[in-house]
Amino acid sequence: MSKIEHNSAKTIDGGAAALHKTVVMVGMMGAGKTAVGRALAQRLGVPFLDSDAEIESAANMSIPEIFERDGEAFFRDRESRVIARLLEGAPCVLSTGGGAFLAEANRRMISEHGVSVWLKADLTVLWNRVRHKDTRPLLRTADPRATLRALYEARVPLYSEADLCVISDGETSIEQMVDRVIAALATRKDVLELS
């Protein structure tokens, strides 16, 4: 992982940007992977893909329905297959589900074909973003906040293996988060060239 936790902004300032590898957004549910990823793709002029949306489209059902009908293990297998397929294409921005980066095979595949960017948010920020949503199957428990805390504590060590880390503090706009991600990516000339 980048030794710097990127929380300063740098913009493209009208210059051209050349993306050489797929940017894979990783992190907890509620970290902003989809919102920031979509805005980043627009700023860089590359496609935005969402692994969860691709899975839902292929299965013709929602993630919670897949979890309920087929279980988490089935979902994780499909998730790995979809990510592998999406990484084969031209460089883009790919948002992944919160659990995708947990599998060692997925981390290796992402490292070989892209660059992982961990949107690091603290537990309070995450809870404030997800507590009113019923689309998170892993939080359908008697104590969803305790469940989120347990997931957070288990996942952070794996997320810390990401190539780059960008702080998502809950007070920064999506556009400012995109600036932070671009600043982090710009430290990797094999990933992003700014001119």
Swiss-Prot record:
Pathway assignment: Metabolic intermediate biosynthesis; chorismate biosynthesis; chorismate from D-erythrose 4-phosphate and phosphoenolpyruvate: step 5/7
Catalytic activity, reaction form: shikimate + ATP = 3-phosphoshikimate + ADP + H(+)
Required co-factors: Mg(2+)
Cofactor binding note: Binds 1 Mg(2+) ion per subunit.
InterPro entries named among the record's database cross-references: P-loop_NTPase, Shikimate/glucono_kinase, Shikimate_kinase/TSH1, Shikimate_kinase_CS
Pfam families: SKI
GO BP: amino acid biosynthetic process; aromatic amino acid family biosynthetic process; chorismate biosynthetic process
Keyword Zinc in record: no
Signal peptide: none
Role, per record: Catalyzes the specific phosphorylation of the 3-hydroxyl group of shikimic acid using ATP as a cosubstrate.
Protein name per Swiss-Prot or TrEMBL: Shikimate kinase
Natural source organism: Ruegeria pomeroyi (strain ATCC 700808 / DSM 15171 / DSS-3)
